[in-house]
Amino acid sequence: MALLGAVEAGGTKFICAVAEQPDAPPIETISIPTTMPAETIDRALDFFSRHELRALGIASFGPIDLRVGSPSYGYITATPKAHWQNTDLVGPFQQAFNVPVGFDTDVNGAALGELRYGGGQGLDSLVYVTVGTGIGGGAITNGQVIHGLIHPEMGHIPVRRHPADTFA
């Protein structure tokens, strides 16, 4: 049976998984440290090459180009992550597996996961905010991830330190 593949491409690690159905538990997962682009992507390609895929979804740190038809669609663009600027993330997977590849931000992927399988079940709209390697957010309204000009860019949130905060 051809499987569904998923990549959560984070600034610290890539989590790759395969499952039979969208709501089924993963059959296999792997955690790959996010090092240099070629090394990290090659390790992910190697993981998926052991499985027959019917589709793949990638949720990535960014900024990324989500404009289908753009010459840089599927790229991680002007990221502060060292060595990852202008990295084609989608292309290597499309070329290797010749299956449909979905692509979105890591926080939009997490927001969609919460809506369908987590704390947002039963809702049709939500905002998801994460604090991890960076700060980001994704928003869903009427069951649809918000993209384009109306996308609320939540990744540029200044955090001012309180003078009494001794956290180092």
Language-model regions: role of each:
Residues I41, I64-S125:
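Glycine-rich phosphate-binding loop and adjoining helix at the ATP-binding site
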Residues A19, I30-I32, S70, T77, ...:
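Residue-level structural signal for beta-strand termini and adjacent loop
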Residues T12, F61-I64, G132-G134:
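Short glycine-rich anion-binding loops that position phosphate/pyrophosphate groups of nucleotides
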Residues L4-E8, L53-G57, G102, S125-T130:
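Short glycine-aspartate micro-motif
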Residues L4-A19:
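N-terminal beta1-alpha1 ligand-phosphate binding loop
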Residues P22-E52, S70-S72:
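N-terminal phosphate-binding loop and adjacent alpha-helix
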Residues A17-E20, I27-I30, P37-A38, Q94-A96, ...:
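Glycine/GP-enriched mid-protein hinge/lid loop-to-helix segment characteristic of carbohydrate kinases
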Residues K13, P25, P71, I76, ...:
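Hydrophobic "anchor" residues
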